Amino acid sequence: MAHSRVPTNWGEDHLLKRLPDARGHASNIRAPGGWIARFDKDGKNWETFAMGFRNTYDMAFNVDGELFAYDSDMEWDAGTPWYRPTRFYHVTSGADFGWRTGTGKWPQWYPDCLPGAYGIGPGSPVGVVAG
């Protein structure tokens, strides 16, 4: 991608050892995790719109053109301090929702990490409709 609306504050400088998920989930995925891009009508000029998602099954726009997404939890993290429930996000330009592999998820108090609009709890989201 030629451009990112999200600050690219991660690096592969090897100053700190990488700590992938001990169970091996997404061990080949590097920060910032899942992302949403936007591009022109010809499918060119891609740019990162938002990132830091774990596994967004579905998203939809409301009548005002605002984007909403439903992101799933990591079921085997349930009961741990870093567990994140299934969440509904209001996706804004330049947002980073902080999902990282393993225990490296950004806490919601990080200034660069947007919280979910609503926490649903354990589950697997499908079928978002907005209007």
Predicted regions mapped to residue ranges:
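Beta-propeller domains with acidic blade repeats across secreted/periplasmic ectodomains
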Residues: 1-131
